[in-house]
Amino acid sequence: MKVTVVGAGNVGATCADVLAYREIVNEVILLDIKEGVAEGKALDIWQKAPITQYDTKTTGVTNDYSKTANSDVVVITSGLPRKPGMTRDDLISTNAGIVRAVTESVVKYSPNAIIIVVSNPLDVMTYCAHITSKLPRNKVIGMAGVLDTARYRAFLADEIGCSPKEIQGMLLGGHGDTMVPLPRYTTVGGIPVTELVEADKLNAIIERTKNGGGELVKLMGTSAWYAPGAAAAQMVEAIVKDQKKIIPVCIKLEGEYGIDDCYLGVPAVIGKNGIEKVIELKLNAEEKALMETSRKHVKEVMNVLDGLPQQA
């Protein structure tokens, strides 16, 4: 299996490293527009192989998409990261142009690839890649829910004092302030989280999760990369190993949850065909209202993208 990671910044390089270290695929191509960056990071990852014992070959290239030909999966991480004071939506104009150009090059050389979008604003960049690629919706997937849910689980693990592996949870909706928490679907070792965490503390964790990316931007001066890179690699693994794993991903909704033509995070079965099935959870009135708020926000930003010049 061959996977291409476009963008050799922090997130892209981390994704490539995880794919190699865990031997998820046979070959990783790391591509970047900046001369030498992808080559250097890929070489560094490959030189780690004798130490940490893996065989996945990593190769870096500078803006030569012919070297990515016949990739099974392509992860798009290209774009500007957030700076303190910025929202994800502030990145739309610049990153839309980048994602559009990258997607066109990707499908030219790997027309059958499944595309995973990591660039922000995530939901709208998934829309951008989807309409540019003209691929079926099951083959263009946004990485958001995996990361948001991981942050939620990590915060809960700290509060409860348990392993994060014991926590199962799900977050829906947009990637950002309008994400939809589902505490009643959250369990800790099979125990409902509401039995272990008081309501006010649980609400505080939910709010912290919503601002999880912003918290890291304030601390580091730029966007996170370890968890996002690992989250993208987990999605790649589910696809190339045909795991039929149920994880929250951003996808174009076509009637699910009563929503049409909008890109939102929902749980789905992920396998060799990308999105194999969308899981529709039964939402209560409050959750439906939050989902509608999320839909409205994402749709507004989609409309902004529609109004941008195509060469933006």
From Swiss-Prot:
It holds the Pfam family Ldh_1_C. It comes from the Bacteria. Disulfide bonds: none annotated. Substrate binds at residues 82, 88, 120, 151. It catalyses: (S)-malate + NAD(+) = oxaloacetate + NADH + H(+). The active site is at residue 175. GO terms for molecular function: L-lactate dehydrogenase activity; L-malate dehydrogenase (NAD+) activity. SUPFAM superfamilies: LDH C-terminal domain-like, NAD(P)-binding Rossmann-fold domains. NAD(+) binds at residues 7-12, 32, 95, 118-120. Catalyzes the reversible oxidation of malate to oxaloacetate. HAMAP family: Malate_dehydrog_3. This is Malate dehydrogenase. It comes from Cytophaga hutchinsonii (strain ATCC 33406 / DSM 1761 / CIP 103989 / NBRC 15051 / NCIMB 9469 / D465).
